[in-house]
Amino acid sequence: IHVDNTLYCSIRDGHQIVKISLDSSDSTWSNVAGMGCAGSTEDMLDQPFGIYVNDNYNLYVADTGNDRIQLFHHEESKGITVAGRALGARFALDKPTNIMLDADNNLFIVDSGNQRIVRVGANGFRCLIGCSKSWCSKLDEVCQPLTAAFDSYGNIFITNQYMNGIQ
């Protein structure tokens, strides 16, 4: 739910992002991103999962099936890839499932297929957690991470599908 009381939803198998105002009596959902069928062009999505809407109504989408993060500027139907294979091997993602943006506009990505959490910002692309590429062998590794969230102190909490828990 955005600060203006608009609910944004990712329709994974519908390959789109929709929104509805919770203050309106109109119960019509509006399409925000995606065309309703899977695709990889700038106006299409493939199994979108996590979403984030910033204060300027720009929408960030974890486009899981396309292994990328798409940015849709407010009222724009075509997205811009801000992380993913299209930007080169250094920025490659594998099934990203969640995204968060901090006050400094750093983008934090749950890169589920690569078992890691990465940050993309002014200082570039950096792996933060799960960087050793080992799979579930140590306490500081993540196993099939799905979502993540920060608390008010800046600590990160990660849901872990493999171990059915939170790290």
Sequence positions of predicted segments:
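Structural signal for beta-propeller blades
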Residues: 15-18, 67-70, 115-117, 164-167
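Conserved beta-propeller blade signature
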Residues: 6-9, 58-61, 106-108, 155-158
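Gly/Pro-rich loop segments of beta-rich domains
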Residues: 24-49, 76-97, 122-146
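Residue-level detector of Asp-centered blade-edge/turn motifs that repeat once per structural unit
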Residues: 1-4, 53-56, 101-104, 150-153
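Short loop/turn segments immediately following the C-termini of beta-strands
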Residues: 12, 22, 56, 64, ...
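Loop/turn-rich, solvent-exposed surfaces of beta-rich toroidal or solenoidal domains
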Residues: 90-122
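Blade-level signature of beta-propeller repeat domains, shared across WD40, Kelch, NHL, RCC1
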Residues: 143-167
